[in-house]
């Protein structure tokens, strides 16, 4: 499994130790998501773009007709996956590009403060949420929402990123 991270934020001073810890955390979360749903790990590629509110607003407007920033967008390469998918591929030697996840770090920072937890926890949640969308999960109705939320919380808890309720 390969996770490619592109940081498109402009004018942001990046602390190397934070970037390295995010890379490791996000790779572990990607593995955990894939393993949890039984998706093949070998030769799987995922792209993550870290961006700002303005860039994600433009993408949200273009692809969802919602002209406002959002926290996370996902663009799956495998159309038609659903949360009951049986992940078998015709050519086991071919690489599998799962898709792209875009996270607005600006929105993640606001939400972390609003929810009273760390930015690391919020980034982890948004990444897992995006991963599950790439894997066919959705939250269009209450049943889907409950199933997806339970899986998100299980993965985050197993990685030590559970919510701290005060």
From Swiss-Prot:
Compartment list: Cytoplasm
A single cellular component GO annotation: cytoplasm
Enzyme class: hydrolase
Keyword Hydrolase: yes
Cofactor binding notes: Binds 1 zinc ion.
InterPro entries named among the record's database cross-references: MetalPrtase_cat_dom_sf_prd, YbeY, YbeY_CS
UniProt KW Endoplasmic reticulum keyword: no
Main location: cytoplasm
Annotated positions binding Zn(2+): 129, 133, 139
EC number: 3.1.-.-
Cofactor list: Zn(2+)
Pfam family of the protein (one): YbeY
Any GO BP: rRNA processing
Domain of life: Bacteria
Keywords per UniProt: Cytoplasm, Endonuclease, Hydrolase, Metal-binding, Nuclease, Ribosome biogenesis, rRNA processing, Zinc
GO MF annotation terms: metalloendopeptidase activity; RNA endonuclease activity; zinc ion binding
Role: Single strand-specific metallo-endoribonuclease involved in late-stage 70S ribosome quality control and in maturation of the 3' terminus of the 16S rRNA.
Assigned protein family: Belongs to the endoribonuclease YbeY family.
The protein's name: Endoribonuclease YbeY
Gene giving rise to this polypeptide: ybeY
């Amino acid at each position: 499994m390969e996770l490619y991270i592109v940081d498109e934020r402009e004018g942001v001073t990046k602390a190397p130790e934070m970037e390295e810890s995010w890379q490791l955390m996000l790779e572990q979360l990607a593995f955990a998501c894939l393993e949890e749903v039984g998706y093949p790990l070998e030769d799987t590629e995922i792209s993550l773009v870290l961006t700002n509110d303005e860039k994600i607003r433009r993408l949200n407007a273009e692809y969802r007709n919602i002209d406002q920033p959002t926290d996370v967008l996902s663009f799956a390469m495998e159309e038609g996956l659903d949360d009951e998918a049986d992940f078998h591929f015709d050519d086991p030697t071919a690489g599998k590009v799962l898709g792209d996840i875009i996270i607005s770090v600006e929105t993640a920072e606001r939400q972390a403060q609003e929810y009273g937890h760390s930015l690391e926890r919020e980034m982890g949640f948004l990444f897992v949420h995006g991963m599950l969308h790439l894997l066919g999960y959705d939250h269009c109705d209450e049943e889907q929402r409950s199933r997806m939320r339970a899986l998100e919380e299980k993965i985050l808890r197993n990685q030590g990123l559970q919510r701290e309720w005060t």
